[in-house]
Amino acid sequence: MASLIYRQLLTNSFTVDLSDEIETIGSEKNQNVTINPGPFAQIGYAPVDWGPGETNDSTTVEPVLDGPYKPTSFNPPTDYWMLLSPSSPGAVVEGTNNTDRWLATILIEPNVASTTRTYTIFGSKEAITVENTSQNKWKFIDLAKTSLTGSYSQYGILLSKPKLYAIMKRSGYLYTYSGETPDAITDYYTTTNYDSVNMTAYCDFYIIPWAQEALCTQYINNGLPPIQNTRNVVARPLSSRSIVVRRAQANEDVVISKASLWKEMQYNRDITIRFKFANAIIKSGGLGYKWSEISFKPANYQYTYTRDGEEVTAHTTCSVNGVNNFDFFGGALPTDFVISRYEVIKENSFVYVDYWDDSQAFRNMMYVRSLAADLNSVMCTGGVYEFSLPVGQWPAMTGGAVSLRAAGVTLSTQFTDFVSLNSLRFRFRLSVEEPSFSITRTRVSGLYGLPAANPNNGREYYEVAGRFSLISLVPSNDDHQTPIMNSVTVRQDLERQLSELRDEFNALSQEIAMSQLIDLALLPLDMFSMFSGIKATFDAVKSMATSVMKKFKKSGLASSVSTLTDSLSDAASSMSRSGSIRSISSNSSVWTDVSSTLYDLPSYMSTVSTQTATISKRLRLKEITAQTEGMNFDDISAAVLKTKIDRSAQITPNTLPDIVTEASEKFIPNRSYRILNNNEAFETSTDGRFFAYRVDTFEEIPFDVQKFADLVTDLPVISAIIDFKTLKNLNDNYGITREQAFNLIRSDPRVLREFINQDNPIIRNRIEQLIMQCRL
C-alpha cells in the first residue's frame, strides 16, 4: 500500500535522532577563550538599568491622566472620560442635548437621614429628597428628566469611598459608573445627538482616553495615585489643554560615548506605523457550499512619509498570534453551508508589527540597549465578506472590532525575498469592541472579536503614531556598517519557493486520473520510489531521504505517535528508543489503555458529537500502525503526493522535506473511520458526525459511544473511503448487493476500481472530493 511511505518515515526516524545526538555531542565540547572586554564593558560594576533619559518628540502621545482642570462648561470630545473629583456635597456635573435628555449628578455625604435639599440644576432651584445610610461612603445620584418642564427621577446610584465619579460620551450613549466601590462598574443612558451634549463641571476634573478605561475604573474604585492628592497639584484652566508646546529637534542623533573604532549613538525618532492584515480564504471541493479555512496571514506593506522635513521609506510586516478557531456547521448535506475553520483575534491574541525604515537609526542595529517606545492606540473594524453560493441567498460575515494598545517593543528581523533587515517589533494587546460580528442568514450572531474574513474593511492600511528611542553601538566611521543589514535570506527564499510550489500542487488536483490513482495507491511505495521522479543522482536521493526524515520527525503525525507512546505507561516503559512503530501495534494492552483514555474525557465534553470527533482524530494513529487489506486515506494521500511530485516542475531537494511533511498533516483533513462488528458498523468523522447502522439494510441504529470505544481495542480501524452518506445514496439510486456493501465498507480497492471503471457518478464524486482535499 502507498501509505507504507509514512510508516517507513515514522519507523526510521530514530536514525535521525542518533545522527542529531552525534552532532550535539560534537557541539558541546568546551574551549577556553580569553576575551578583551574593551572600553564599553562594565567590568567590576554592579548591574545597572540604563534608561534613555529625556526623549524629545513632536508626536502627541495621549497622557493617561490629563489634569486636573478647573470647573468649567464645555462640549467634551467623544470617547474621553471626565473623571470628576468633588471636595464637598452638592451638584457635581450636569449635561443636556436640549431636546430629550437632561442629566445631572449630585453628591451626598455619609450618614444623612431622609431629607429634602435644594439644588441649583440648569439654572433652576430643584427640591430633591435624598438620603445616605452608609457610614463611610459618599453617595452619587444621577438625576434625569426627558423634557424641560418635567420632574427629575433618581437613577444610577454610586456609593464611593474615594469620592470620584466619571462620565463619557460614546456611540450614542452617555456612560457613567454605578454600584459600590471597590466593585463599581460602568452604566449608560441612551440619548440622541449625544455628540452635542454640553457638560458643566462644578468641581475639578481629569480627562482620560477611552482606551484607558480599565485605569479609569481602577481610579473610581481605589482612588487617584498619591501624587494627585498633594497640595502641589494645582488645577489649571481647560484652555491650557490647547496650548501647543514646541520642542526643538524632536528627531535627533546624540553621541553618548566614543572610542577610536566604536561609538554609542542615541537615536530619538518620531514614527508613523502603517500596517494591514492579510488573509487566506480557501474553499473546499465539492458543490461549492463549503469553505475549509479563513485565516490570517502575515502582510508586508511599504510606504513613505515625512519626518521632520525628511522623506522616509518604511516597511512593515503585520502578523498575529494567539488566534481563536471558530467553525460553522450548517448540516451534513452536500448543499449545506459549512465553514470548517475561521480565525478570530480577541483579547487573548496579540498583533505584531515589525517596522524598518531607511533612516540612520536602522543602519546599525547589531548591539542595542535602552530601547523604549510610546504609541497611540488604534481601532480595527471588520468589513463584509459574502460567501458566494451556487444557489440561494449568500451568507455574509460582517462586523467585529478590536482595539490595539501598545504592549512593548523588541528587536526583530524582517525578511524580504532577498535580504533580512534588522527592525523593531511592536507588540499590541487587544480588547474587543463594538460592533460584534455575525454570519447573516445563520444563527451565528453577537460574537466579539475581529474575524479574518475582511479585517481591513476596505482600508488600505491602519495607522499608529508615536515615538521610539534606542542606544546603538555603531562604527565610529559613519561610512561603515555592520553586515547583517544586507545578509541574504536563505530561508525566506525557500519560503517563496514553497509558496509557489503549494499553488502548483493545489492546481494539479484536477489533472489526476482516478483509475491510475487507485492503482498507484495499491503500490508499496517506499522512500526511493516516492522520490524517483526528482532528477538527481543516487547519492542526492539518499541525502534527500535523510532530509525528509529529519523534517518528518517534527511533523504533527510523528509528534502524535510519540506523545501516544509516552502516555501508555506499561508499554512505553518497556520500549527502548530504537523500538519502531511496529512494536506498538503488536502490544494488545496498548489500545486497551487508549480506549479507556478516549472514554474518560473531561466533563465539559458532554455531547456525543464532541466525544466521537475526539476519538476519530486518534483513530488514524491506530490505523497507520496495522496494515489491513482495505485501502485507507493515507494510501490516497501518498498516491496523490507521488502523482504531484512526478508532475511538478518546481519540486527540488530543498523543498521536498517541507512538502512531504505538510502532505502528511494537511492532506484529506475531513476523514471518517468505521469499526465493523458483525452486521453492525460504527462510523465517526473528525468533524463530529457519527452513524451506527446495519450493513445489510443501511438502517440506522442508536450510536453507543461506550461500545464504540471498547471496540477500538479489539477490532481493526477502517478508513471510510466511501462514507455512510455516499453508501446510502448509492444504494437508494443504483442498488447494491450485500457483498458489494461489505466490500465498500471494508474499502476494498478492487470493488472501488470496478465502480470507477463503470463511471459511477456517486463513487467518482466521492473520490474527487477526497482528491480536492489534498491541498497544502
From Swiss-Prot:
Locus of motif KID motif: 644-646
Region of interest (Spike foot), ranges: 510-776
Domain of life: Viruses
Motif YGL motif location, chain numbering: 448-450
Annotated segments matching region Spike head: 65-224
Record-level GO cellular component terms: host cell endoplasmic reticulum-Golgi intermediate compartment; host cell plasma membrane; host cell rough endoplasmic reticulum; host cytoskeleton; membrane; viral outer capsid
Residues with site note (Cleavage): R231, N232, R241, S242, R247, A248
Motif DGE motif location, chain numbering: 308-310
Region spans: Spike body and stalk (antigen domain): 248-479
Coiled coil stretches, renumbered: 484-511
InterPro entries per record: ConA-like_dom_sf, Rota_A_VP4, Rota_VP4_MID, Rota_VP4_MID_sf, VP4_concanavalin-like, VP4_helical
An annotated GO BP: permeabilization of host organelle membrane involved in viral entry into host cell
Residue pairs linked by disulfide bridges in the UniProt entry: C203-C216, C318-C380
Hydrophobic: annotated span: 389-409
Keywords: Capsid protein, Coiled coil, Disulfide bond, Hemagglutinin, Host cell membrane, Host cytoplasm, Host cytoskeleton, Host endoplasmic reticulum, Host membrane, Host-virus interaction, Membrane, Outer capsid protein, Viral attachment to host cell, Viral penetration into host cytoplasm, Viral penetration via permeabilization of host membrane, Virion, Virus entry into host cell
Family: Belongs to the rotavirus VP4 family.
Other remarks on this protein: In group A rotaviruses, VP4 defines the P serotype.
Full protein name: Outer capsid protein VP4
